[in-house]
Amino acid sequence: MVFLFTGCFKPSASLTFIKKTTLPEALGSRVPPESEDVELDALTEKSLVRYGSLIRHYSDRYQMDWRLVLAVIRQESRFQHDAVSHKGAYGLMQIMPETQVELLDKIGVEEATSPRNNIRAGVFHLRSLYRYFDEAVGDDRVQFILAAYNAGLGRIRDAQAIAKYLGHDPNSWRYVKDALPLLSKRYYTLHRQVWPEGKPRSGYFGNYRQTVNYVENIMQYYSDYKLALN
């Protein structure tokens, strides 16, 4: 499926907590006593007012942590609803145009350009990926779905295959992350030992650093949001 096996590539975005704030009433959220001194940056605060209810709604529908979704949006588009990448991905969650067919089949969305549908499509995609990594647990599982959202499920599956061939746990992000560089064409001799066809099933992959940074950035945002938002 195109929606699951293709990914998107985005520049890194830093998150700085610079302004102490109470949470928007629209979210129905409260800061727990132990997190009273945690501060949200102004960009996140403003975006929560605009999109918080949609993020919460579709995260609840598809059983995802809304703070993780918030972290993904921060990394993907910096909360810009009209963001467009050089690959054609668009919106808050940077949905690729070729995902439209599956969107129609799975959730009945005719377009994913509006903030509502873009968020819905993105959260649905995250949940779909979540099901593919049921043997990973905790943060490993989260990191797998983030990597697949960025690089495509197929590439992460290929990296898992290499990790397994090398005798490592294919459900540990630590080892799969280390296997991503080995998807480069320069390791063709290794590929011949892993796959009968002699190369990764989703093709060669040379931009592993971007995917690793992508995952690390979102995990940091997610950690910060879990402290600041309840």
Language-model regions, residue ranges each:
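Catalytic and substrate-binding regions of cell-wall glycan-acting enzymes that process beta-1,4-linked
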Residues: 25-26, 145-226
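N-terminal export signals and maturation junctions of secreted/periplasmic proteins
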Residues: 3-57, 81, 228
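Extracytoplasmic
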Residues: 50, 64-69, 74, 87-90, ...
